[in-house]
């Protein structure tokens, strides 16, 4: 998709995004009011709304504010927010659809906000269940992303070679940037080294469009340089390995030609990773990569 098409799509989706935020807030108000009449006051709604909007607009503020460390903080918050928002919408919309189409809900006949004050207390239970579900799934998602999984897949290639076989570690989509940490990179390196592989291949998207998003890049490169294998570590570029401004996953037209930040290449050299750019290499006179 071209940059102009991304821009048009972003402009089209912006009001839809705002409507979704209003929809979520209305249900949050309804649930709070069902919990206690005291929560119907502005003393509750104003701070809750301000806090919610802080998260809701964090993709935009993180995009516009470039001064560190606030920029980095907002980008981290916005990334977590966008991931959590998917589950918020999924569960609330599912709950609302079931409420409207089944005739068996205790509060089926109620419509927010016109009948807000007549909503029964059962909304406390159902709303609490939905909120708990959102929190559990979101927390699981964060913890799941921090784990390193190893999957072993035997692959047979019908070609002659002087080698009886190769044990290759294939990793991809490191997305080194706002939400990556040195400890996580270290965990990946330690996991690779524990497998005693012959070759390490990195299948693109080492970076996340912004070299400056990496905290302490020299240290991260040092950690990656600790990868151990018989024939070395090789990589190829991915679509995120270019310098490009992104807002909530959308790229925007730029006056200058999009180029790859030279620091990406320097980083890989520092990390001992060989980048293959539309090329093959003969390794140890035994096989081609």
Where on the chain are the PLM-derived regions?
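Soluble catalytic domains of enzymes that build or remodel membrane lipids, polysaccharides, and related
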Residues: 151, 156-289
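Non-catalytic terminal accessory segments
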Residues: 1-146
